Regions:
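Nucleic-acid-interacting cores, centered on viral/eukaryotic replication and modification enzymes
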Residues: 1-352
């Protein structure tokens, strides 16, 4: 899921999210393209090779030639199944979308309806093939377990699922929900080894470390997979009694929100999570910043490009003294696509 691991010239491809704002019928075309699964990870990876072909195109030439090259490259490299009718449709749509003709369509008055239309995912693409930011905005968590299942027709945007919030608030931290499947293991990318803690369903212990997980499970006579992760890392997950555990794609920490102003920069108020967070930052050599972005196991780590993108999103929301979980999540729930569109433009070109 290294969606943001793209070269800088590919940034404009993200602008498809704002296309329906002013181009009328193009909105249906974009939705259709998404529905057909045109924007899969392999396709965007294939776009890296287009610079060579762009240089060879004469002025005013149709984009179909390079789009065809991208699809053929994608098919060759990633083994995509060729469907002639669908490929022809994608050629037509992509020649329009990636021609640069509509890249200025994102405007300040873009409505949540327009944004929802751009990301309405009635498609055959799997959850894992979608960009993490897009998936969390569109409520990738709907109260049920995800098993890489296809998006369904009733996912219409930010406020279409009653009772479901894009984020969960805890300790002034915004956590973007991905799914609620239970697994006892943490990926070393997002938490230093030895800091994981598990909750034993047999004896009720909440401080079982990763090093003691196997022996503890043996002592209690249960499978090690029965251990549930318990408030591990800097609020990447949290256990609510009587409710399924929830896991998150990434956590955004606002060091300047009211609950953090009396603590060290980029640390949380909770002593336990502060200690873990400091160790995480030191181990990953993350530079101090107002917003700290931590990846969860579902992402397998966050590249610097991804980190800059999310920080750009948070900064565009003008979160001065407001709690990030209140302000940023409210912006997402209200479908303020302008914030995201502005953050997307040039996000990967920002200096490290």
């Amino acid at each position: 899921m290294q969606w943001f691991d793209m070269c800088e010239d590919d940034v404009d491809a993200w602008d498809f999210m704002g296309l329906p704002a002013r181009v009328g019928g193009c909105g249906a075309a974009v939705t259709s393209a998404i529905r057909d699964g045109a924007y899969v990870a392999s396709k965007f990876k294939a776009l890296r090779s287009l610079d060579h072909h762009k240089a060879q195109l004469p002025p005013g030439a149709c984009m179909k030639q390079e789009t065809a090259t991208a699809i053929l490259h994608s098919k060759k490299r990633f083994g995509m199944e060729q469907r002639s009718a669908r490929c022809a449709r994608r050629l037509e749509l992509n020649s329009m979308i990636f021609s640069g003709k509509f890249l200025r369509a994102v405007t300040k008055d873009m409505t949540s309806e327009a944004f929802a239309a751009a990301v309405r995912l009635r498609c055959g693409a799997k959850v894992a093939t979608l960009p993490p930011m897009l998936s969390c905005i569109c409520h990738s968590y709907n109260g049920r377990e995800w098993e890489q299942r296809e998006w369904v027709d009733h996912v219409h945007g930010l406020a279409s699922l009653p009772g479901v919030n894009a984020t969960t608030r805890h300790d002034g931290v915004t956590k973007f929900v991905f799914h609620d499947t239970v697994s006892p293991f943490c990926d070393a990318f997002w938490e230093p080894e030895g800091l994981q803690q598990f909750r034993c369903t047999e004896c009720g212990a909440r401080d079982v470390t990763s090093a003691d997980a196997v022996s503890h499970a043996t002592t209690c006579g249960i499978d090690v997979k029965a251990l549930k992760r318990n408030r591990s890392g800097p609020d990447n997950e949290i256990w609510w009694e009587g409710v399924n555990q929830q896991y998150y794609d990434f956590t955004v920490i606002n060091a300047l929100c009211p609950s953090h102003v009396n603590s060290a920069l980029d640390t949380l108020v909770s002593a336990v999570t502060r200690t873990k967070h400091v160790k995480y930052v030191e181990s990953k050599k993350i530079p101090p910043n107002r917003f700290t972005v931590l990846a969860c196991f579902t992402l397998g780590g966050v590249t610097e490009a991804t980190r800059r993108f999310i920080v750009k999103c948070a900064g565009a929301a003008k979160l001065e003294d407001n709690d990030l979980a209140e302000s940023f999540s409210v912006q997402l729930q209200h479908g303020n696509a302008r914030i995201l569109a502005q953050a997307l433009r040039g996000a990967l070109r920002a200096p490290a």
